[in-house]
Amino acid sequence: QGTDLQAGVSSDQIAARVLGRETQLASLELAIDGRDFVGSCDDGFSCAYTNTISWANDTTPLPMENNPRVVFERLFGDSGSTDPTVRKARLAKDASLLDSVTERADDLSRQLGTGDRRKLTQYLDAVRDVERRIQMAEAQSDRELPVVEQPAGVPGTFGEHAQLMFDLMALAYETDLTRVTTFMMGREITGRTYSEIGVPDAHHPISHHQKDPAKLAKLTKINQYHCELFAKFVERLSNTPDGDGTLLDHSMIVYGAGMADSNAHASQNLPILLAGGVAGIGGRHIMYPEDTPLANLQLSLLDKLGVPTESLGHAT
């Protein structure tokens, strides 16, 4: 509780450790809600548990970015353009800055004690990761990219915001800038409203519906809205050529929620949807035995991705 964190590496980051070796960005973590919550959020537990679903290790939650402009800059740089000439100039400038940082760090290292030198080593490891990404980007800089305008910022409605984030995810896959993304459409205990679909009430209070028909109807509207936006993303992937098929053919997509019954805070029998050619045979509804951990499914999916993993969470 409090500021003490104890979770576990998430399946997306296990995949990123392997699949991310060949791309500019190992992974991309996205969200709709901001990171305005700090301290204790739910029953005295850290807000880190509700602000993200991606964990690098037991104690390191990864921040999820909700600003489309920042996501665009992570993918294509701050030049605001996907033009190859502009991108090359920006990469050369970034590489020059990193060379300067490394030289100064080497000089500083000789003047530090053991403890400070260890901290500097950690910092330099992060610098080398940035350097690796720049080198990867330089190798790919001649590639023709779709002409895309840099987003101005966060759109005004949930639907526009979610659609833009899904589009950026699809663009990241299409350009092979990353092969692993995680998108949290709604944080736990969210107070978001959905006036554009006729639901002005906050999401979290509605989820504790106590079987009130009016609240259930509104909750159903929200769930349908989320699914419709997700379906558009899947459709876009299915319409995007990729090698001998489409992006959807070569993708594995997992869509779901952390609760099956929000009114009772029940996390058993979670509804999980799989899409994409890598996810296996579609068009099926599979009922797992009672108390089967979700981690069992995640281990199977990692294996299909070519990332065999011995254990994960409470997998049996």
Language-model segment annotations:
Residues 1-316:
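Ligand-binding pockets and gating/stacking loops
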